[in-house]
Amino acid sequence: REAGHDVTTATLDEPEHGLTDQVLAEADVLLWWGHLAHDEVEQAIVDKVHERVLAGMGLIVLHSGHFSKIFKQLMGTGCDLKWREVGERERLWVVDPSHPIVAGLDSYFELEQEEMYGEHFDVPTPEELVFISWFEGGEVFRSGATYRRGKGKIFYFRPGHETYPTYHNENIQKVIRNAVLWVASPGAPEHQYGHVEPIEPISRKG
């Protein structure tokens, strides 16, 4: 809201998980965070979100949302990883300094306490790798990655365990603000698929 966006929330226990046809139709960007209750999300809602992403809605998947039905469906893989929760330090390195998502950041920033995610992360090779994380226990992780599916842009961003104040961190907030602007594609041109009539006369040959 501080960046001038019209923001609303949708939760699991709402009818249709708050993701009604109208909400999805009006959304330029959807941020998805989930934990433990991934299987409780109705497949019909997942399919509607999937269709909207293919049609151009941006999607930002946060932290344990890597196991969400929608992320798995879009990735086509298991999206599994290593994890450990002991409150260790995470250092996020910017590995694509020209990317709009990292605008205003230094070459790295740190979170004093976070859950560890470690490789191998079972996702397709990212189209753009934006962040790599190093953890105090020695692991590394591809913690900021972008994809395109249909007309939609997707950004996966690793930090955000619920027991730590990660989303109060100024750098994390900056990344999310930048990512919202990057994944949004309002006004993208419509394309026609299937059989089409020619737009110019075609002369008979032979």
Label every PLM stretch briefly.
Residues R1, D6, W83-R158:
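Catalytic beta-strand/loop cores that center a nucleophilic Ser/Cys/Thr
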Residues E14-H17, H35-D39, G65-K69, Y108, ...:
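Solvent-exposed loop/turn segments at secondary-structure junctions
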Residues V23-L30:
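Short acidic/histidine-rich motifs immediately flanking catalytic phosphotransfer sites
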Residues A37-L105:
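A glycine-rich, often tryptophan-bearing local segment used as a flexible ligand/cofactor-contacting loop or short
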Residues E2-A3, F141, R149-G206:
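Extracellular ligand-binding/catalytic regions of CAZymes and related secreted enzymes
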Residues A3-E16:
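A short beta-strand-loop structural module common to alpha/beta enzyme folds
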Residues L31-W32, V61:
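Redox-cofactor binding/interface segments in oxidoreductases and associated redox assembly factors
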